[in-house]
Amino acid sequence: MISVQNISKTFGKVTAVENVSLEATDGKITALLGANGAGKTTSMRMIYALIKPESGQVLVDGINTHDSPVAARAKMGVLPDARGLYKRLTARENIVYFGRLQGMTEQAIKDRSEELIERLGMASFINRRTDGFSQGQRVKVAIARALIHDPQNILLDEPTNGLDVMSTRAIRRFLKDQRARGKCVLFSSHVMQEVSAVCDDIAIIDAGRIVAHGTEAKLLEKTGCDNLEDAFVALVGGEQNA
Amino acid sequence: MNLKLLKTVCFKEILENIRDRRTVMSSIVMGALFGPILMVIILNVTINMQQDKAEQQLSVAVVNQEGAQNLMRFLVSQDVDLVTLEGSPEDAIKNKSHDVVLAISDNYADKFSQGKPAKVLMYHDASAKGVAKVSVNRLRALINGYDRSIGMQRLQLRGVSPRLLQVVMIQEHDQATKESRGAMLLSVLPYFLIMGLFMGSMYLAIDTTAGEKERKSLEPLFLNPVPRDTILAGKLAATVAFGMLTLVLTLVAFKLTLPWYPFEKLGMGFNMGPKVMLIMLLVLAPLALLAGAIQTIIAAFAQSYREAQTYVGLVLIVPMIPSMLLMFMPIKEQLWMMAVPILGQNLVINELLRGDAVAWDAIALAFVGTLIVGLLLAWIAVKLYNREKMLFAD
């Protein structure tokens, strides 16, 4: 359960995020939908406590990420915008390294990696060095690495960006599995079909503000559109703003 | 700070960098072997050249040989090869066709027979390097010898004891030992040792900070429930470990190349026993911490690997400063100097090279002084990463 309350961030004179609030509840997939540069990555970075919001707060399972970032991070599994695998390590070594940093026992790391290798279909490349991996292989390893400690809250920044159909479907299936297990999933995206296909709740962000929040049906009803893309364009104030 | 997590980070950085052959080659092999091997080659080549020149037949270009036939006969009897010079002596020296040219003045024979100083002109280039000097000195010694022997004969002919000319006799007592003469030769050693450890940690300092930022793996790494200072401390530990490894290898490489130093030919000696090596290691070890920390701090401010390489490369000049200073300026060492990082190491190692027993308080001061500065810099490096600006390359 992630609760974001009125967070803001400015970089110099540019206001990147202003007064953003949203709730991501357990057992649901929540999307942060916005165009490029709308403030998705900055919002996500504040939510996963990498940077400090100038005002407002973020609670992860009731823990204030600002006051106790280390405890809050233990409750989260994050796939950041930057996948950043270690190229000189194998996929498995990448995953094990993060397991150790999560403070897991070697046995727990082993069991959990086997499970993730199975679920994400990584068996064919798990013992290879990640240098030269395809985009899809890289995202899978990065997800496995982020979720090695089986966190309750899963945050992903544009998880299917640049992936082919097969990889995209594999990731979607994986996220739906996680939802079924009662996890709280929050991901940011600018791809309408993506959001439409997997999300229960959608928060639309534009120019650093949340302009609408609700289920897809609710957003369509509110705007009177028959698809999410049209609804999105209507909500962010028309195409002239793009 | 959680030591287990620190170790996890440290071991991962070491594993990752050992797999990068280029890093291992450049930092460890270059850092450790470059200095000792370069020293062996340079010393041997110069000494062999000088020795060859000293043993070879001396060749002297002479202008106006007929002017001083007696002197010429003497030189030939001393196995000097006399060459008649065509052209001006100035040009012969300038275009290096001869090391030294002897010109006999026109009135040499007259002055000689009158018992007045007869002039010969010696052309040479006093700023010439190396072996040319050997020829000049040999010729000067020969002419001085001739001068003395003729002078003595003249006095004896007049019934005067040549000893009257010896008013003061200098008896030299050179207090230089074999070791201290060797120390002069080896005064670049501290520099190579310090340089080696700076080079050894350089690539890790860059790779674990600016490199990781450039590869965008810093963000996912910091998302783990590990305090940033623990992660940085782990990285710094790996960096320092590489510096230490290079240091140990440099010492071993130097020890192993010692038999190839031309000490015998120079009447010099250097005894590098286990105790000397251990003291060197002891005073240099905290410098590895200092080097790693400084390099990490500088690399932290760089946005890319390349930028970091430029800045950190400049830091390699720092260890040169005290070594250069000591080479050209004979500083009277004071105890407090031992506490100054790099300077203290230079002084202690120079004393060891001279074969002097180094006082334990000097060693302790060099160790503690550098350790304190190193720890302070390490603390700054570790805390730097609490700043958000340090995290992203974009």
How should these model regions be labeled?
Chain A
Residues 213-214:
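ABC ATPase "signature
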Residues 150:
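Conserved catalytic motifs of ABC-family nucleotide-binding domains
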Residues 88, 129-133:
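Conserved ABC ATPase signature
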Residues 154-158:
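Catalytic Walker B motif of ABC-type/P-loop ATPase nucleotide-binding domains
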Residues 96, 100, 107-125:
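Conserved ABC ATPase "signature" region
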Residues 24, 56-67, 71-72:
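Conserved ABC transporter NBD signature motif
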